[in-house]
Amino acid sequence: MGITRGVRERYVVLALLALLAGTSRARAESLAELLQAVAANARFASPARADVRIACGEGCKATGTPAIFLGRGDALYVEVKGGQRALIRPAQILVARGGKASEAAPGETLADTDVLLEDLAVFTPAVLKQPQISDDGPAGVVVTAAPAGRSSYALLVNTIDRERRAIIRTLYYRDLINNLSKTRRDAAFARVGASWRPGEITVESVRQATKTHLTLSWREAPGVPDALFEPAGLGQPSGLGWP
C-alpha cells in the first residue's frame, strides 16, 4: 500500500508540473490573442462620439475648452472648439492647416496639453515592436514594447485590464528607454456599443510636472458624416454641433 500511495503521489506531482508548464506556455502564447482582443475593443465597430472637456494646469490655455472625438473603425476625428482639427489613424495623423489636410508635426499635442495626438490613436498590435509581458497580476497584464513605426517615444509600457480588454495605464519613455516622460491613466469606463470607453483620461508629465485631465461623455453616433473620416474633410468646416 505504501508503494502504491507513493507512486500515485509521484504521478500527481508530475501531472501538476505538466499543468503548470502548460499554463506558462498558454500565457506566453496568449499575448498575441490578448493584443488582438484589446485592438478589437479599441476599434469603433460602430461610430461613437465623445464630448470632451479639457482641464490642465497653470499656463495651459486649453483648460475649460470643449472638444469632440468621433470614432469609426480605426480612425478618430478630433476637433477642439475654435481651433484644432485632426484625423488620427494608427499609421498616420493629419491636421487641418492652411485650409487643407497636412501631416501632423512630430510630437504635436492636443491643443497645448500634455496629450500628444498620437496618444489618441486607436490601438492596433502593429504599433508595437516585439511586445513582451513583463508582469501579470491582479492589477492587470503589463506589456512592454518599443513603438514599431514613427513615434515620439522610445518605449511604451501598457497595463491591460484582461476583463475589459482595455489599456488602463501607459508609461511613455522618450529619447531613452529609461527616461520616463509621462504617465497616462484611463478610468470611469462605460460600455458604448460593443466596446469599453474611458470616461476619464489623466496624463501627468514627469519632466514639466504638469497634468492634463480629459472628461469624456460617450454615446453612439450612427449619423456621423463620412466626410469627417476622409483627408479632404479637413479642408472644410465639420458642421458638428456643440453641447
Question: Positions of the model-derived regions?
Answer:
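Short amphipathic beta-strand/extended segments with alternating polar/hydrophobic composition
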Residues: 63-67, 87-91, 101-108, 157, ...
